[in-house]
Amino acid sequence: MTDALMSASRVVLRAGALVPWLVLTAVVCAGVVLVDLVSAFFASAAFVLLGPLLPIAGLGLSYVPSVNVDYQLVVASPYSTLRLLLLRAAVFVALAAPVLLFCGHRLEGVQFGARVLAHTAAVVAVGLAQSTLMAPTLSAAVVSFAWMSLVQVVLMAGGLADITSSHAVALAVCTAVAALFVLVVRRRALSTDWRYS
């Protein structure tokens, strides 16, 4: 009986580690729907601005000890830093994919959601590659700021169609591939400061 209660409490604690990310996802979804009621353009722009930040925010938050209840287990794990980083990134992209596809379909169709998902993969890949220079939490913050700045510049210079065009998606895919190549080449330079903080 006691073992069953202990294992159930562990499951609840592990599920509790996703609460900040789930709240962030719910806020973004609610914001997209709310803005969609006001104006379709602003909803799409907000979705393109905030959608790709969901996985990178989750990845950055997962390396904060006060948020992640399994932090000590990760620190003591025998796996390489590259493997831990890639597994976490894959989990957060997989969790964000249905949300992005659903909201994209709600706004402008399935293609729109898939194109935003391509940008999401590029943002996460650049964040992973940048983790070879700094801690994953700082890397996530820097990449998020860079993405928001890039979207603002493109929206001011052109329009939403420029961000979701096939050329922009091809550039995002090439950026993701190049960033993952940099990550693999520089894997020995991955910051491990988070393991000892």
Can you name each region flagged by the protein language model?
Residues 75-81:
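Short helix-to-coil transition segments within interhelical loops
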Residues 28-30, 55-58, 80:
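Short, mixed-charge, low-aromatic patches
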Residues 1-44, 132, 171-197:
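Hydrophobic alpha-helical transmembrane segments
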Residues 29-33, 145-156:
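Aromatic-anchored segments of alpha-helical transmembrane domains
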Residues 156-168:
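Extracellular/periplasmic helix-loop-helix junctions in multi-pass membrane proteins
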Residues 40-68, 86-152:
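Secretory targeting signals
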Residues 48, 167-170:
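Juxtamembrane helix-entry segments on the extracytoplasmic side of multipass membrane proteins
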